């Protein structure tokens, strides 16, 4: 009987890993689409005539819209226990928004805002439920390495997406124009369709991913309890969001203004940052399973100087170093922050916990996006110093969260 039990566990673990990999490939094509668009979005918005204050405000408003609604959709996912419908609907809205950017006419930046925000809406609908489904499977193999694998494959797509855009610009062989941007957005519709096709395949093959994790209670959704460790963790994430630009738009604009590289090659810089992102996600994700949130503190400290290197420097090599620092922060946070929520929450409230965390993150990103825009207009020193101080403060809070989490975790009883 014991042998059968071990075989069942092995089979369950293999199925869980297959599901994680399949969802990671879905994310690969999703990021290929989204990051390909992100690599030129700042320049596209500038070409359409969008003012700088609107550029940063839309980035923050998108974060606010997406993250504030994630709490609601996270609650609904947990309450109904129907995670897949939210994932499917969210991905459909998300993926169709990028090719629609090809329909924006000259000086039509207001219409572009609609499609940008609709993409954020799609993410809000899908993200808590999708993260919850992956976290259920991750309990079989370890949260850190599971989310790290997903983030690494994400970033393969994030590297390829900008290369697609670069190829479109190179093949047209003319000065960057609205037509080139439209063609690029249309080509990104191909990976968008691949993403949706694979997602439907995942739904058919794994209709109940929540069965990968054993339930801690018999009843349905329980009271949403915020532990001290989770509260400090969310506070750390919110402070990190104050100064860490998770959008490439402002960095893109600043590099473009400095003229250190031709506009057509800007996506290559973004692709490089996403490559660093992938390596960072793998390294710090695996490290998370060994040392917990200390890994996140290390990663955030490594990303702290990116403001001085990108905004404060005017040489290409300094910008490369700055984007390396920025990529480390993006990769570590994308994998370890997701792992952290899974570690600090119960199965029954997993999607709601993701929604709450991302609400804190999004409100902070939106609230301080105007300050970031103001500091950028004032001086490179002002924005760089603000970035440094907020990231260092967040790293301290992540260390505190790890200490509290250890204190809250029951020690195993020795027989």
Language model features with spans:
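C-terminal ends and interior cores of transmembrane alpha-helices
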Residues: 92-106, 302-314
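Glycine-rich segments within core transmembrane alpha-helices of 12-TM secondary carriers
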Residues: 148-165, 358-368
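Cytoplasmic membrane-interface "Motif A"-like loop-to-helix N-cap segments
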Residues: 79-91, 289-300
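Helix-loop boundary and gating motifs at the non-cytosolic
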Residues: 8-64, 232-236, 240-258, 266-269
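Helix-to-loop junctions at the C-terminal end of transmembrane segments
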Residues: 69-82, 169, 280-292, 376
């Amino acid at each position: 009987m014991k042998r059968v039990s071990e075989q069942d566990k092995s089979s369950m673990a293999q199925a869980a890993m297959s599901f994680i990999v399949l969802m990671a490939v879905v994310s690969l094509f999703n990021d290929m689409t989204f990051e390909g668009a992100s690599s030129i979005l700042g320049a596209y918005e500038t070409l359409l005539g969008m003012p700088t204050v609107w550029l940063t405000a839309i980035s923050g408003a998108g974060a606010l819209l997406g993250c504030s609604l994630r709490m609601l959709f996270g609650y609904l996912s947990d309450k109904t226990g129907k995670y897949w419908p939210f994932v499917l609907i969210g991905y459909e809205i998300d993926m169709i928004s990028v090719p629609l950017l090809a329909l924006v006419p000259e000086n039509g930046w207001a219409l572009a805002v609609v499609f940008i925000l609709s993409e954020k809406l799609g993410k809000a609908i899908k993200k808590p439920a999708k993260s919850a489904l992956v976290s259920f499977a991750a309990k079989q193999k370890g949260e850190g390495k599971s989310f790290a694998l997903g983030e690494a494959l994400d970033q393969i797509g994030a590297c390829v997406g900008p290369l697609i855009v670069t190829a479109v610009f190179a093949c047209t062989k003319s000065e960057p124009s609205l037509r080139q941007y439209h063609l690029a957005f249309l080509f990104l519709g191909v990976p968008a369709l691949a993403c949706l096709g694979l997602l439907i395949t995942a739904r058919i093959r794994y209709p109940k991913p929540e069965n990968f994790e054993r339930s801690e209670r018999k009843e349905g959704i329980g009271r949403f309890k915020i532990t001290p460790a989770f509260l400090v963790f969310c506070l750390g994430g919110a402070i990190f969001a104050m100064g860490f630009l998770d959008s490439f738009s402002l960095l893109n604009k600043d590099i473009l203004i400095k003229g250190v590289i031709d506009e057509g090659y800007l996506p290559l810089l973004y692709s490089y940052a996403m490559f660093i992102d992938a390596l960072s996600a793998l390294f710090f994700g695996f490290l998370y399973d060994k040392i917990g949130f200390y890994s996140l503190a290390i990663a955030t400290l490594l990303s702290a100087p990116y403001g001085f290197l990108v905004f404060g420097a005017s040489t290409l090599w300094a910008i490369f170093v700055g984007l390396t620092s920025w990529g480390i922060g993006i990769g570590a946070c994308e994998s370890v922050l997701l792992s952290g929520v899974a570690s600090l929450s119960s199965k029954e409230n997993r999607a709601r916990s993701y929604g709450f965390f991302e609400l804190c993150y999004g409100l902070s990103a939106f609230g301080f996006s105007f300050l970031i825009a103001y500091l950028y207009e004032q001086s490179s020193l002002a924005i760089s110093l603000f970035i440094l101080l907020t990231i260092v403060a967040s790293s301290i809070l992540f260390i505190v969260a790890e200490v509290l989490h250890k204190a809250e975790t029951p020690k195993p009883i020795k027989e």
